Design a protein with these regions (language model features):
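Active-site metal-binding loops of divalent metal-dependent hydrolases
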Residues: 8-10, 39, 121-123, 152-154, ...
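Structured beta-strand-rich core segments of catalytic domains in phosphoester-bond hydrolases
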Residues: 14, 39-115, 202-206
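Short, Asp-centered acidic motifs that coordinate Mg2+ and/or phosphate
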Residues: 3, 32-33, 116, 147-149, ...
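Active-site beta-loop-alpha substructure in enzyme catalytic cores
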Residues: 116-160
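N-terminal, active-site-proximal structural segment of metallo-dependent hydrolase catalytic domains
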Residues: 1-58, 71-79, 136, 220
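Metal-dependent phosphoester-hydrolase catalytic domains
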Residues: 92-93, 108-111, 143-149, 154-220
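Active-site-proximal beta-strand elements of phosphoester/diester hydrolases
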Residues: 2-12, 91, 115-124
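Active-site environment of divalent metal-dependent phosphoester hydrolases
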Residues: 12-15, 41-44, 72-74, 126-129, ...
Length: 220
C-alpha cells in the first residue's frame, strides 16, 4: 500500500489567511495522513478559533483529532492530525518534560493493509538532554510496534540526536537534508519502521508558517 504522509508545524496560525493557506497546501499535496504541531484551540492569539477544525473545514478529511499538551492563554495548545482512515484507537503519552509538557500521540488506523500505528509528537527546544530523555521514552513505545509511522517537530540540533531510536528510516537525514525550519534547521521529520519503504521526499515551502511542510511517499 502506498501512502503520502506529511508533517507540518503550523506555528499557531495567524488568522484566516494562514488557515486558508495551510489548508490549500495540504489539499494540493493530496495527503493520506498529516501530523500537525503547534495547534491552538480557543486561544486568544488565534482569535479563540479551533484551528484544527478550521483547517479541516477546507480540507474535508473524514477524521481529525487534537491532543492537548498544555493549557494556554484561555484555551488549549497541542498537536493534531488529519487522516482519511477510520480511527480504531487513540492514546496520549506524557513525555518527560522539564519546562513545557510535551506529548506523543498514538493513533491506530484501519487501512487497506490492516491496522497501522501512526504517531505524532513535538519535542522540547530547551536542551539536547531533555530531548534525549524524550526520545528514550519514545523508543520504549516504538519497540512494541511491528510497523509504524512517526511525524513530528523534533527540535534537534543535529541528526545524531535521533540515533537514540533504532531500526528506523528517516525522510530528513544527513544524506538528504531538508531545511524545514526557515530560520535554519532540519528539525521536522517523518520516521518509519525499517520494514516501510520511503520512496520520495518533498519539501513544500510555505509562506504561512515559520516551518516548511515535509512530505514523504511511502510503501507500507
Amino acid at each position: 500500500m502506498n501512502l503520502r504522509i506529511a508533517t507540518y508545524n503550523v506555528h499557531n496560525t495567524d488568522g484566516s489567511r494562514s488557515i486558508d493557506g495551510i489548508s490549500h497546501e495540504i489539499i494540493k499535496h493530496k495527503l493520506d495522513i498529516v501530523g500537525l504541531q503547534e495547534i491552538d484551540v480557543g486561544v486568544l492569539r488565534s482569535q479563540r478559533k479551533n484551528t484544527l477544525g478550521e483547517i479541516n473545514k477546507l480540507c474535508g478529511y473524514p477524521s481529525a483529532v487534537f491532543s492537548k499538551s498544555i493549557d494556554y492563554d484561555g484555551g488549549e495548545y497541542g498537536i493534531g492530525a488529519l487522516f482519511k482512515y477510520p480511527l480504531v484507537s487513540m492514546e496520549k503519552y506524557m513525555l518527560p518534560s522539564v519546562y513545557e509538557q510535551r506529548i506523543i500521540v498514538k493513533l491506530v488506523l484501519d487501512t487497506e493493509c490492516g491496522y497501522l500505528s501512526f504517531f505524532n509528537t513535538h519535542l522540547s527546544y530547551v536542551s539536547r538532554e531533555s530531548r534525549k530523555e524524550q526520545l528514550k521514552f519514545i523508543r520504549s513505545i516504538l519497540s512494541k510496534e511491528k510497523k509504524f509511522i512517526l511525524t513530528g517537530d523534533f527540535n534537534i540540533e543535529s541528526f545524531d540526536e535521533l540515533d537514540v531510536l533504532s531500526s528506523i528510516k528517516t525522510a530528513n537525514n544527513k544524506t538528504t537534508p531538508h531545511n524545514t525550519f526557515k530560520a535554519g534547521g532540519c528539525i521536522d521529520n517523518i520516521i518509519v519502521s525499517d520494514n516501510i519503504k520511503i520512496k520520495n521526499v518533498i519539501l513544500s515551502e510555505s509562506e504561512y508558517s515559520d516551518h516548511n511542510m515535509l512530505v514523504a511517499d511511502i510503501s507500507v
